Amino acid sequence: MESVAAESAPAPENEHSQETPESNSSVYTTFMKSHRCYDLIPTSSKLVVFDTSLQVKKAFFALVTNGVRAAPLWDSKKQSFVGMLTITDFINILHRYYKSALVQIYELEEHKIETWREVYLQDSFKPLVCISPNASLFDAVSSLIRNKIHRLPVIDPESGNTLYILTHKRILKFLKLFITEFPKPEFMSKSLEELQIGTYANIAMVRTTTPVYVALGIFVQHRVSALPVVDEKGRVVDIYSKFDVINLAAEKTYNNLDVSVTKALQHRSHYFEGVLKCYLHETLEAIINRLVEAEVHRLVVVDEHDVVKGIVSLSDILQALVLTGGEKKP
């Protein structure tokens, strides 16, 4: 579900056309402040919601079959939404109990979601972060980045219903619909190297031979959503994302996490188009176009030999466009 309601938000008038590129640095910030979360909600969309009394096994299978990465959790006793069930929860459980002599992984999946949250996820438990449909998209971007989350439920304060799940991808796609209506800020023509957007130190990576269990530990420790897979020369050959981990549940192969990430990724080799890459000399505008067109969450920054130099994510892009006006994040 990546449809975006373009018709609900009128294109802004190009009233800044006489301004210089230098003075246009806040144009995207202004756009986000003048549009509400409601403007982005499609007229028709699919939303997966789980009751906390649902069996964990069924919940993760539903994530896979619906192609979603997370779902709001409804507590029937409290008559309210209490959190999100995400692939990160699945990873935390797998990593913590795979080598445990006390708990068998296959037993864990028989539990209800509420049991998981109360017993097994208490260390990583987070209260629900949500937003009103009347809040601005600027507030939504700020909340996503400040709380270091990837999904923000839009909840109607009057009915208590979840209307939509906002993500970095959907917000950037919405902005891209209107981007040609704006005077182009100077920073859009600057390179990644000039703007220093992205992460270039301590890049979390795995080798082609790295066991899945080790990769899960890196996800937990570094709190990243994807790991470039590199060969012996440091060249990127694949990418292992959190979303790939959910296939362990679908295929019931989570009882053998000692296989390599390369073997674990074979399930999608028939449709994998390759790692989406970019270079430090490319402009921010080119990077945004590639991210939106490919509908990916990040690009791997490489040199001319495909050696990994960094990662630029949707979060990095939105922070630069909306919160810091092209400047390096504080």
Swiss-Prot record:
One Gene Ontology biological process: fatty acid biosynthetic process
* Family stated for the protein in its record: Belongs to the 5'-AMP-activated protein kinase gamma subunit family.
A single Gene Ontology CC term:
nucleus
Which PROSITE patterns does this entry report, sorted A to Z?
CBS
> Which part of the chain is the CBS domain?
42-102, 124-186, 197-259, 271-328
Stretches for region Disordered: 1-25
Annotated residues that bind AMP 1 are located at: M84, L85, T86, I87, T88, D89, V129, H150, R151
Q: Which residues carry this modification: Phosphoserine?
A: S260, S269
Q: Where does ATP 1 bind?
A: R69, M84, L85, T86, I87, T88, D89, V129, H150, R151
The yes or no answer to whether the keyword Nucleotide-binding is present is: yes
Detail which positions bind ATP 2. Answer: R69, R151, K169, S241, K242, F243, D244, R268, L276, H297, R298
Q: Where is this motif: AMPK pseudosubstrate?
A: 137-158
Q: Which UniProt keywords apply?
A: ATP-binding, CBS domain, Fatty acid biosynthesis, Fatty acid metabolism, Glycoprotein, Lipid biosynthesis, Lipid metabolism, Nucleotide-binding, Phosphoprotein, Repeat
Residue positions annotated to bind ADP 1 are: M84, L85, T86, I87, T88, D89, V129, H150, R151
PTM comment: Phosphorylated by ULK1 and ULK2; leading to negatively regulate AMPK activity and suggesting the existence of a regulatory feedback loop between ULK1, ULK2 and AMPK. There is some ambiguity for a phosphosite: Ser-260/Thr-262.
List residues binding AMP 3: H150, T199, A204, S225, A226, H297, S313, L314, S315, D316
Q: Can you tell me which residues bind ADP 2?
A: R69, K169, S241, K242, F243, D244, R268, L276, H297, R298
Q: What does this protein do?
A: AMP/ATP-binding subunit of AMP-activated protein kinase (AMPK), an energy sensor protein kinase that plays a key role in regulating cellular energy metabolism. In response to reduction of intracellular ATP levels, AMPK activates energy-producing pathways and inhibits energy-consuming processes: inhibits protein, carbohydrate and lipid biosynthesis, as well as cell growth and proliferation. AMPK acts via direct phosphorylation of metabolic enzymes, and by longer-term effects via phosphorylation of transcription regulators.
Which protein are we looking at? Answer: 5'-AMP-activated protein kinase subunit gamma-1
Q: Tell me the GO molecular function terms.
A: ADP binding; AMP binding; ATP binding; protein kinase binding; protein kinase regulator activity; protein-containing complex binding
Q: State how it assembles.
A: AMPK is a heterotrimer of an alpha catalytic subunit (PRKAA1 or PRKAA2), a beta (PRKAB1 or PRKAB2) and a gamma non-catalytic subunits (PRKAG1, PRKAG2 or PRKAG3). Interacts with FNIP1 and FNIP2.
Q: Does this UniProt record's set of keywords contain Lipid biosynthesis?
A: yes
Return the Low complexity bias intervals.
Answer: 1-12
